[in-house]
Amino acid sequence: MGKIIGIDLGTTNSCVSVMEGGNPVVIPNAEGSRTTPSVVAFKEDGERLVGQVAKRQAITNPDKTIISIKRHMGTDYRVNVDGKDYSPEEISAMILQKLKADAEAYLGETVTEAVITVPAYFNDSERQATKNAGKIAGLDVKRIINEPTAASLAYGLDKMDKSHKIFVYDLGGGTFDVSILELGDGVFEVKATNGNTKLGGDDFDQKIMDYIAETFKAENGIDLRNDKMALQRLKEAAEKAKIELSSSTKTNINLPFITADATGPKHIDMDLTRAKFEELSADLVQATIEPMKKALADAELTINDIDKVVLVGGSTRIPAVQEAVQKFTGKEPSKGVNPDEVVAMGAAVQAGVLTGEVKDILLLDVTPLTLGIETMGGVATPLIERNTTIPTRKSQIFSTAADNQTSVDIHIVQGERKMAGDNKTLGRFQLSGIAPAPRGIPQIEVSFDIDANGILNVSAKDKGTGKEANITITASTNLSDDEIDKAVKEAEKFAAEDEKRKESVEVKNNADSALYQTEKALKDLGDKVEEADKKNVEEKLEALRQVKDGEDLEAIKKATTELTEEFYKVSSKLYQQAGAEAQQGAQGTQGADMGGNAQGKDDDNVVDADFKVEDDK
């Protein structure tokens, strides 16, 4: 069985991990970093960039650079690039392809399976969209796992010998979750979860961006938010300032030539203090308090029952966030995990559980939101309450609302509001063929089945006729099977094009290298190369120069090989000549030595004769 990788598909950064020797290991990307920016860009020539290289060129290419796509998962949002619409699943798939390729390079084998994390508060359509993104990227998503749960898996892997309750506060780039788990005897049981899928580090950046833009507008009368390139520079500066204010109390924001008007170029040079930043973002920090209270209440615990507090997500490095969590829990958060990597590591642990590499761990997760159907009067009738352990199956008997009704429409909703219209619609389907009868007589059994990924299947059965209908929830905002298949083919085409571009670069680099090395060697050898040989090599050099900048890779390869082979003949010939000359020289020296030795031997004989001692007679 091949390796199953663990992926944290984040709003601003993503990370991939794998189990090695019983422990999760973060896989560095091709650029050497342990996390990859969740950024996709398209160049003018159609080339696709993902990760750090995409983020680097965002200022000069703002229209074709896509960031924070995770915030649109499970919606009908589309990104238009060069006249083509891309769904959030397709853009996310490009990020997943990059992570998959980095993992394959690290492991030296093909990777086809993954465990992918999602915010605990992701609804059904957002989870399904994540799974679809994996499929488009060529990954069989074996499990969708909640981010705080994954973090607790990584945190608790070496702490399974004792029972304790963990409070996980997860503030990422675009989403916020809080989960309370109980760990004991290898069982990770989620007691409750709460959160906000529209709150994260991006919002803290936005506060700084707005502050800079408003200050600049007040001084210069120009709103930089109307200039895409200036806006991208503002975003980068805001993110940098936020990070610096985590370790220092003041930072300088310097953006020369940010714009210009009739009076000339305009610059930004201003200081931002941590105190001002905390004032600007106080409402965001405050917005995380209520979900913490709700999670505790749903878990039927008090803060005194909590043993450990774990911070997850890069935004938890913000001092005001840490202070808020510490004040609420009364406990110092654990510093033993890297907030940027722990979720991916937990996903790798879950992958290890699936492959059997990690034993004696049982993960009991929950569904974050109440699931139900619309009943008479537009009421939302719950079948599965929020924080129910999954996988689970619940059934309930309903009946008709009118006499002689032969069909019923099943409207599935997700949320905590009392009226169906105020909750999120997950799907609709119809059960027909019901035997005519007075209202309230037919018995229709509606069953909700949630799998371990948190994805819902709904069925309805008329107990009188045995007629049955069912639906696996795929919201209208998600891609259809045909659209997914089409996206898979396009992703494969993109991958093939990327591979072709890579091959083109390598072939042309080899050609340039062969030209340079041969020209240099010819120059260094000078007159040692015979004119005929030099002419042959120069012909091959010229032949390669003629084709090296074209797109016919086979012609470039052929010309490179012919040049290399021709020069090899010349160098072999020179080597043989040098060897022959050296051998002749050695023979001449040896002859001279032998003559000297013969003379020396005669001399020795004379000396021996002179000093010959004879016995006395």
Curated annotation (Swiss-Prot):
Compositional bias (Basic and acidic residues): 600-617
Protein name (record): Chaperone protein DnaK
One function term, GO molecular function aspect: ATP-dependent protein folding chaperone
Pfam families found in the cross-reference section: HSP70 (PF00012)
Gene name of this polypeptide: dnaK
Function: Acts as a chaperone.
Protein family membership: Belongs to the heat shock protein 70 family.
Protein induction: By stress conditions e.g. heat shock.
Disordered as annotated region, ranges: 578-617
Gene3D superfamilies listed in its UniProt record: 1.20.1270.10, 3.30.420.40, Actin, Chain A, domain 4 (3.90.640.10), Substrate Binding Domain Of DNAk, Chain A, domain 1 (2.60.34.10)
Keywords: ATP-binding, Chaperone, Nucleotide-binding, Phosphoprotein, Stress response
Organism: Clostridium novyi (strain NT)
Matches recorded under InterPro entries: ATPase_NBD (IPR043129), Chaperone_DnaK (IPR012725), Heat_shock_70_CS (IPR018181), HSP70_C_sf (IPR029048), HSP70_peptide-bd_sf (IPR029047), Hsp_70_fam (IPR013126)
Superkingdom of this protein's organism: Bacteria
Biased composition (Low complexity): 578-592
Modified residues (Phosphothreonine): 175
